[in-house]
Amino acid sequence: MYYNEGMGRKTQAPVSTRYPGDTLKRLDRRARVEGHSRSTLIQRYVAEGIEMDEHPGIVFRSGPAGRRPGLVSGADVWEVVAVHRSFDDVQRTADWLEQPASAIEAALRYYEAHRAVIDEWIQRNEEAAEAAERVARAQQGAS
């Protein structure tokens, strides 16, 4: 998994591959936009491509907190897992998130394969929500 810095990085070995010129131009343009090297993007694309092959229905998207896995149809995997923990029921989770049950099951399968990474996303979100709540209470008290 490359979607979050340092997660899943193992020993690296050089590999020589050839790409069409147009592909390299697009890759270099994307690397400039994202501020990464060509090599970094290739590593990310390969790792995430394998993950998507192994977990149909899962894609990776960028955001302010980094790259994260999510459902093709919307919610991030960590969001699905957090809601599922509340309901402990696939259909109720699907209804709440307005997703098909098959998408919820795909997210839960991904979670089973990458529990520590998703738990970290959930923890970070909970910490951010608690911090925002403290700020809101402090602002209310100051009024």
Description of each model-found segment:
Residues M1-Y19:
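Short Lys/Arg-rich basic patches
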Residues T17-Y19, L27, E34-A47:
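Short amphipathic alpha-helical segments
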Residues P64-G74, I122-S143:
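Intrinsically disordered, low-complexity basic tails/linkers immediately adjacent to helix-turn-helix/homeobox/MYB/SANT
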Residues H55-R61, V117-E126:
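Short Lys/Arg-enriched helix C-cap and helix-to-coil transition segments
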Residues H36-S37, D95-A106:
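Short, basic interhelical loop/turn and adjoining N-cap
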Residues E51-V77:
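Short, positively charged interaction helices/loops
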Residues S73-D88:
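Short, amphipathic alpha-helical "recognition" segments used to contact nucleic acids or chromatin
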Residues L27-R30, R92-D95:
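Short alpha-helical "recognition helix" segments of helix-turn-helix
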